[in-house]
């Protein structure tokens, strides 16, 4: 079936959600106010929602809600500000923000869509609030287990040894054989902006290297942002992953049975170097209503064939 790509749609409403602890979460609504509600969960953590208009969602049938997770994008305080308190930014703070946003916008149930880190947050939310989720649409699957995090920031270095050596060299010499993520956290909490900026550039150089070597990899995908955005992204990312995203090991796969009755698509790339397809496979086995698609011509970014599968699911879900 030929899946449509719709005319660009921008927001019809923007606003800020006051979380009650000094944070303000930016959100926007796109499409039809009377449409089927969707919440789009961005990656990173710390990347912020994309600024580009939506094309895959029918703006006459869907009400798409995008938001910037704490301390990134247009949410305040921004993570580039050393005064932003990272102790108030955890997976479970973000889950609570999503539920608070749903209530604020008067949504009964919504389709939850996420990619990469957004899959982790989408699953954490859906497993805590399954009665509020109509469907799940998950791409480039990552559940932020310790083993996945260790693969991304250590194991993948077997394929990119020169880039990983540069990443490792970004921390003080006496910390290079220890916990690299904790070392980067310390650098990102430095009062010296130059130290934070250098560490952010080193971290994002590694992320770029991993994705550039994949099919359809985009050079500069992570580093192509201004310095404040780089600092916020890496500060948040290092903070989350050094804490194992405040999840028990394999928690989101282990508890996937809580999603029974929620239909969903699990779409991932066969050649995803950062988030290998094993996790998507295990998740789909544990989730009774999941449909798994592994795209043979995709990495983390995806491909046109994978996007067709995703758009088919979007078209299917709008009629449920």
Which residues are covered by each model-predicted region?
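N-terminal cap/lid segment of alpha/beta-hydrolase-fold proteins
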Residues: 3-24, 237
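Conserved HGGG/HGGXW glycine-rich cap/lid loop of the alpha/beta-hydrolase fold
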Residues: 18-78
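Conserved acidic catalytic loop of the alpha/beta-hydrolase fold
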Residues: 92-110
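Conserved hydrolase catalytic core segment
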Residues: 108-147
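Alpha/beta-hydrolase
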Residues: 151, 155-255, 262
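Short beta-strand/loop motif that positions the catalytic acidic residue
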Residues: 259-260, 266-268
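Conserved alpha/beta-hydrolase "acid-adjacent" motif
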Residues: 273-279
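Catalytic active-site module of serine/aspartate enzymes centered on a nucleophile-bearing elbow/loop
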Residues: 290-320
